[in-house]
Amino acid sequence: AAAAPGAAGGAQLPLGNRERKAGCKNFFWKTFSSC
């Protein structure tokens, strides 16, 4: 589990895998324009 940055880190970090597309319009709009 600790060796899975895409699964564990993606769920905890705001810039993870699921948050990247889910919160893309939440906080990514101010950082990344080409979401």
Swiss-Prot record:
InterPro entries: Somatostatin/Cortistatin_C
Assigned GO CC terms: extracellular region
Keywords: Cleavage on pair of basic residues, Disulfide bond, Hormone, Secreted
Top-level taxon in the UniProt lineage: Eukaryota
GO molecular function: hormone activity
Paired cysteines (S-S): 24-35
Compartment(s) of residence: Secreted
Family: Belongs to the somatostatin family.
Function, as annotated: Somatostatin inhibits the release of somatotropin.
Protein name: Somatostatin
Organism: Lampetra fluviatilis (European river lamprey)
Gene label: sst
